[in-house]
């Protein structure tokens, strides 16, 4: 749950080397989600712990490194977050979730997909700066992929269209400050 969804966007988690080596594979190497693959596999087999103490921080801006390695260049455009980069990333996310669920014969992919929908604001917001027409097309593609499973997806979508990213970020930041943490949806 929490460990799995948070590790995608924030670095800083640690997996024991001997545990990770057991699952070494090229399956998800160029996807940018190899760390998630290792985390999922090791958490299924070994005890895991999660701490809410912040030890890393994501800073907005700068040049993204997606597509910088040779194995990623066929999937991602280096130096920018294009619509296709975002869609490819989210498609790989689904492939990985489905692979893990099939591998372990459970419905974790359905649970994770619903959770992704509930917390899809950053996934939507990252492309809002491209204009309404492009943003609507991007959101349509996410819906087709299955990311619109909760009403939260639509709240974020319409709020981003009506209020824009800057106002939405302010509202979210204010709510987190009032509540003291990210709301449990």
Predicted regions: what is each one?
Residues 8-24:
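Conserved nucleotide-sugar donor-binding
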Residues 10, 28-29, 125:
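Short, flexible active-site loop motifs that bind/organize anionic cofactors or intermediates
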Residues 19-22, 29-54:
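A short, conserved alpha-helix in the catalytic core of glycosyltransferases
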Residues 24-25, 184:
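Intrinsic structural disorder/low-complexity segments
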Residues 37, 44, 53-185:
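C-terminal subregions of glycosyltransferases and related glycan-biosynthesis enzymes
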């Amino acid at each position: 749950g929490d460990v799995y969804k948070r590790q995608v966007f924030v670095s800083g988690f640690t997996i024991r080397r001997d545990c990770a080596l057991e699952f070494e594979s090229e399956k998800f190497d160029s996807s940018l989600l190899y760390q998630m693959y290792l985390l999922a596999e090791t958490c299924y087999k070994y005890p895991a712990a999660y701490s809410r103490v912040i030890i890393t921080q994501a800073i907005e801006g700068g040049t993204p490194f997606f597509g910088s390695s040779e194995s990623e260049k066929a999937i991602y455009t280096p130096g920018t977050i294009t619509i296709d980069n975002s869609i490819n990333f989210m498609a790989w996310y689904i492939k990985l979730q489905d692979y893990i669920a099939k591998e372990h014969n459970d419905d974790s992919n359905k649970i994770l997909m619903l959770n992704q929908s509930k917390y899809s604001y950053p996934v939507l917001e990252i492309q809002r700066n491209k204009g309404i027409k492009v943003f609507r097309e991007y959101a349509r593609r996410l819906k087709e992929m299955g990311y619109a499973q909760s009403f939260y997806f639509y709240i974020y979508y319409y709020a981003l269209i009506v209020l824009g990213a800057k106002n939405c970020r302010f509202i979210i930041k204010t709510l987190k400050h009032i509540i003291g943490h990210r709301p449990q949806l």
